[in-house]
Amino acid sequence: MIFWKNFFQNSNINASSEKNFKKLIVLDKTCDKIEFKDIYLSSNKNINLYELEQLCDSVGWVKRPLKKVKIALKNSSIIISLIQKKDANSKLVGFARATSDNGFNATIWDVVIHPDFQGLGLGKVVIHQLIQQLRQAEISTITLFAEPDVVSFYKKLGFIKDPDGVKGMFWYPR
C-alpha cells in the first residue's frame, strides 16, 4: 500500500474540477516558447466513436468495427479521455479504459495519446487516473498488455513484466 501512496503523492499532475472535466496544466516545452495546452480529463463514458477511431488511426492502430468498439466501451468499468478545447471546438487527444471483475482484478486497455501530444506526460496522467480509480474500488491486481516498444514506459509507472514468472496465455480461433 505504501507504493501506491507514494505513486500518487509524487505525481506532478495539477488539476482543478470543472463539471465533469478536470483541467490539466500542460506545458509544451518542445518549441522555442512555452505554450499552454487547454486539455481536460474526463471520465464520461459517452465517447464519440468516430473521434476515437480518428485518434486510433493517428497512431497507426488497426481499424476495429465500430459496433464492437461500442460494445467494448459499454462493458468497460472506467473510461478516461483527454480533450483539448480550443474556442468552441474540442478534440479527443487521449484515451484509455479498464475492465474489471469489480472484486480483485482489472485490465487496462487501449491507452492512446495523439502523436502531437505525446511526450507531455499525458499517458502518465491517464494511467495514474485509471490506477487511482481502480485502487479506490479496492482492486488489487491491475494488468495490461503492451507492445514491445512501450514496455519501458509502463515499467517506469510501476508495472512489472512477467511477475514471478507468470505468463499471459491466449487462445485464438483457428
UniProtKB/Swiss-Prot annotation:
The lineage of its organism: Eukaryota, Rhodophyta, Bangiophyceae, Bangiales, Bangiaceae. GO terms for molecular function: N-acetyltransferase activity. The keyword Chloroplast applies. Its EC number is 2.3.1.-. The keyword Transferase applies. This is Uncharacterized N-acetyltransferase ycf52. Belongs to the acetyltransferase family. Ycf52 subfamily. It is found in: Plastid, Chloroplast. Its main location: plastid. GO terms for cellular component: chloroplast. InterPro entries: Acyl_CoA_acyltransferase, GNAT_dom, NSI-like. It comes from the Eukaryota. It is an enzyme of class 2 (transferase). SUPFAM superfamilies: Acyl-CoA N-acyltransferases (Nat) (SSF55729). PANTHER family: ACYL-COA N-ACYLTRANSFERASE (PTHR43626), GCN5-RELATED N-ACETYLTRANSFERASE 2, CHLOROPLASTIC (PTHR43626:SF4). Residues 42-174 form the N-acetyltransferase domain. Keywords: Acyltransferase, Chloroplast, Plastid, Transferase.
